[in-house]
């Protein structure tokens, strides 16, 4: 059982945190996350594709939905991206403002273009008032496909990231 007066009793509360390709905001204010992802696959196909993945950029949207509970007013919100090597940098930093009833909240939408230099798991760490709320994983996979050389053909052709799988 939760302690009386604990942070869990007061809010704000995390309702959702996810990565998707895009977010639709309907006229009635309802949001729809399109193509929720937790993996991006980068491919290189050719007679001699690179052994290691070349860096690439990828567009994605981070959706965070918070409900106020008893919290009111402005609260510092940030998201740090942690690479597979443990290097961290802020990718979203803003103020979440809570007003109204305890079931009211804020949708924080971070549209970003991220450069991926390495294969592995990248973590999106979500903080409110410097307290961790959650971590969202995104795995980057590199697929290298060697094809036989045909007459007049040379090298390789890097492919755009394939459709991510979730």
Where are these regions (language model features)?
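Contiguous segments within soluble domain cores/interaction surfaces
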Residues: 2-119, 123-166
